[in-house]
Amino acid sequence: YTLKCNKLVPLFYKTCPAGKNLCYKMFMMSNKTVPVKRGCIDVCPKNSALVKYVCCNTDRCN
């Protein structure tokens, strides 16, 4: 089974490579409403002072 994650434009998505079983979206802390990056990832990154990550593990949940 391969996860599908949305790309930055939500109408488009990609099939994740094996081993990348999370979808994520990344926000700048200065603007938490508009994601600046979306895709597949293997481990959810930690949030920092500048960026916030939201990760999930179902198809196109990002």
Swiss-Prot record:
It holds the Pfam family Toxin_cobra-type. Disulfide bonds join C5-C23, C16-C40, C44-C55, C56-C61. One of its GO terms (molecular function) is toxin activity. Coiled coil: none annotated. SUPFAM superfamilies: Snake toxin-like. It is found in: Secreted; Target cell membrane. Keywords: Cardiotoxin, Cytolysis, Disulfide bond, Membrane, Secreted, Signal, Target cell membrane, Target membrane, Toxin. The keyword Chaperone does not apply. InterPro entries: Cytotoxin_Cobra, Snake_3FTx, Snake_toxin-like_sf, Snake_toxin_con_site, Toxin_cobra-type. Its main location: secreted. Residues 1-2 form the signal peptide. One of its GO terms (biological process) is killing of cells of another organism. GO terms for cellular component: extracellular region; membrane; other organism cell membrane. Expressed by the venom gland. The keyword Transmembrane does not apply. Shows cytolytic activity on many different cells by forming pore in lipid membranes. In vivo, increases heart rate or kills the animal by cardiac arrest. In addition, it binds to heparin with high affinity, interacts with Kv channel-interacting protein 1 (KCNIP1) in a calcium-independent manner, and binds to integrin alpha-V/beta-3 (ITGAV/ITGB3) with moderate affinity. Belongs to the three-finger toxin family. Short-chain subfamily. Type IA cytotoxin sub-subfamily. Monomer in solution; Homodimer and oligomer in the presence of negatively charged lipids forming a pore with a size ranging between 20 and 30 Angstroms. This is Cytotoxin 7.
